[in-house]
């Protein structure tokens, strides 16, 4: 995976650093490609969250790989009525708020947290029009 520069984002008064990147799975059935969003709370680099978006998890793959709605080179998920670009700060802000409200606490955690159902999460979260 190519090295990505960390980007800074302010979420509810806290500063986070984040990056996106492409990597390849070692074990896969349909596709080795995956994207990952990594987010750190500033000064808490030992407890990032890694959100994985695996093409392998795309629900359209078993039906017809050629009709897949996941564009790896763009880092976004597209379905009939929305596009979610993982490189947009507004999208990252929604993801950070979601994980802070659920289970991720970077100030008390001592280890990285991995979330492997990124595609499913994107389909469940509400992204306002124009955020991408």
Regions found by a protein language model. Name each.
Residues 1-30:
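Short N-terminal edge-element motif at the start of the domain
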Residues 5, 26-28, 40, 85, ...:
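Generic structural signal for short, flexible, solvent-exposed coil/loop and linker residues
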Residues 7, 18, 35-37, 51:
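Hydrophobic residues positioned within well-ordered beta-strands of beta-sheet architectures
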Residues 12, 19-21, 40-42, 52-56, ...:
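A structural detector for beta-sheet-dominated domains
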Residues 21-47:
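Short, surface-exposed, low-complexity cationic segments
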Residues 47-132:
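Acidic, low-complexity intrinsically disordered segments
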